[in-house]
Amino acid sequence: MDFYNSSITEHADPDRRWELWKSKYDFAAVPPIPAGQKMAREQLDAAWAKYPEAMSQIRLGAAALSPSPQQRLTEVAELLGAQGPVRIRLIAFVGTFRRSAFSMGVKDGVSTIAIPLEDSAQDHALDMTHEFTHAVQMQQGGWTGQSVASAVFAEGLATRVTERLNPGFPANIYTTSSSAWLERCNASLPQVLDELREHGANSGAQAVSKFTYGTGTAGIDREVYCGGWFVVGRMLSDGVSFSTLGRMTQAEAEGKVAATIDSLLSSSTPATKSGSR
């Protein structure tokens, strides 16, 4: 609110608005890499015109989140067979007006999840499910760090849990994409899977961000989500339960991803439905 009010009071131009955002807010759904600041500036400029009509909801703070975060976390934990408490630090923030929820990983046994206030109740339900899946899965599996292969598993599982607990939407809603993107993903899947398999062992923020935000050699952006949707979909259709997936260690998940990619590449009709149990 301080950032917004100051920008309005000063009639700030885009450059001054960015300075105020940096000094008073500086919180965005961008990767921790040098290009992240450029992305944050572009997001702010694109979203600014939408702020006024959303201010009444933003002023509610965490009370604007619906369904109940506790209720949704419980549902995710039960589906994934959580065996023990799951500790969450929930941050309600002003995002980009385009479903920009994200997870900040686990520290001292607590997962930090950020959910945009300005989104609709439907988007809150979808995104809390997705991000809470990350929290439950990483805590139950004892994950630390991330590789490209483990990111494929994590994002694939989150999209499929979101599908299970929020049924009835087109598949692209679960992958947070356009229908055209999902069609391109499906058409280019062999190339995407080849690339993810080749780079699966790569780790670190820079390596993972390339496949999470960037565009790969197959010409598809967000290859981790593209591959993850189909890879975990195949695991589920092969009879692996959500609870088994939810408790996998990072090493187990990475191995399962590699084996499933091989299975998908040898099949002429990759699984597009979860077949979940």
PLM features: residue spans?
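Inter-helical turn/loop segments and adjacent helix faces that build the functional surface
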Residues: 139-149, 168-174, 238, 242-244
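N-terminal mature-domain "stem" immediately C-terminal to a signal peptide or N-terminal signal-anchor/transmembrane
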Residues: 1-41
